[in-house]
Amino acid sequence: MLLTITSCEIESAHITEPTINEENGHEFVDLGLSVRWATMNVGAVKPEEFGSYFAWGETLPKETYTEESYTYKATTQILPLSDDAARVNWGGRWRIPNPDELMELIENCNWTYTYTPDLNLYGYKVTSKINGKSIFLPTAEVFSGDKITSSTMYGYGAY
């Protein structure tokens, strides 16, 4: 599975800044959860872009994604920051969300599958049940070997 969504740790329990803010030059949204969520994927310049493709534990995109080209062999679900694509590429306090944070996002948000015809774009609008703020997760194609397979019209993709 490919994850490019990112989160940013919260330093205090009481947050008073605006709903959309920045960490190290990248915007985030406070969904009222334990971490702040990026408005776009690593490697994207707009929320509707897929961003870069990363293998788990690798910090640079590559041209081929096969078992032979995979360099990260650890089986941990939480990456050391030196192997975290968000931290290495965006700096600051950015990092890939851990499984508990992903579950929190799933359980505390409404997920609406959407299609934007003028952009030919499928994805999920993820809206907080806590404060009504949202992020958009485009359903990206799946990169296998050196080929990209479109799977966006079926509601699944790589995140």
Report each predicted region and the residues it spans.
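C-terminal motif of bacterial Sec signal peptides marking the signal peptidase cleavage site
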Residues: 4-7
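Conserved positions within compact, well-structured domain cores
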Residues: 12-159
